Amino acid sequence: MKARTFALLAAVAPAAFAQAPQIQFDSAPEPLKLPDGMYFGELTGVAVNSKGHVFALSRGNTSGPAYAAAATQLLEFDQTGKFIREIGKNLYAWSYGHTVRIDPQDNIWVTDKGSDMVVKFSPRGRVLMVFGRKQEASDRETGPLERHKPPLAPEVGRFRQVTDVAWDPQGNTYISDGYINSRVAKVDKLGNWLKSFGEPGSGAGQLNTPHSIAADAKGNLYVADRGNRRIQVFDGEGNVLREIRIDVPFPPDAKPALGATPNVEKMQAAGLPLTMAPGAPWAVCITPGPNQVLFTSDAYPGRVYKLSLEGKVLGWLGESGKQLKQFGWIHEIACPSEKQIWVAELLNWRVQKLTLK
């Protein structure tokens, strides 16, 4: 979308705001309570299981050199926010955590962008299954610090900067892969590779950093195609069903959480990913139950959006900032209900529990 389109939207803001109302909400101060001497780093993920336990994925246990340090920590809290345990301490797959999800059986899944791996834990915290392979420390040719232009061709079973997971009613797992391969992989409930779909690009079915993924009750997949500033909806075989774009006006003086105000026209002219553009989806989450809705977020102007599964914006909330009820790059959303969501923030090193009115 061209910058002039954003200008036009701003010009008709009063009418457009009426079509996409602002949602009133509250945020509980410090909903997760860490023990003395333990600290969060960047919060990259948050998930909630059937008992109401909250799982936070933090880049808080940094080890190694300042550059390319390992930083992944998976922490569990009970429904009151009391710390229970750390899961997978010193796990081989830990490098640079990306997202955490809970499947219908309360198994815990973590994607790690740095190690190119996906790990499935049991509810007790035991490793059940691993996907992908971490590069060998001595492997300079394909190691994590090397950037190939063009990137290496995708391989069956190998991920490159993997981002997220989702499941369909048949128990198949879908893995968004990711910053490099720009595709979605499908594996069955036994872990067998079935197929992949998507490739780098901006056309229908092509992807530019599939950053987050969620599935509805029918097994349709909602992929946060962040670099293309859209959500693409696929069926379980990878056929494109529709495209969702978020074009909600925002104040002209809206401040970014970090860096300069994004210039969409310049980004497009340079062929850059639209990661920081208004409406570019960083996270997607679909509520359970018979009447499902979709929540997503952008980095600028820093909002959460509530949508129907067909793509209608039902409302929005929040803005960029460092105070309670403001957001600093929401990286993942957990939505156990339509009225309660959890957001994990990179820049503010925190999780917020939001109650929508």
Predicted regions, residues:
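Bacterial N-terminal signal peptides that target proteins for export
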Residues: 1-7
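Bacterial N-terminal signal peptides
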Residues: 7-16
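Eukaryotic scaffold repeat domains enriched in small/polar residues
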Residues: 19-357
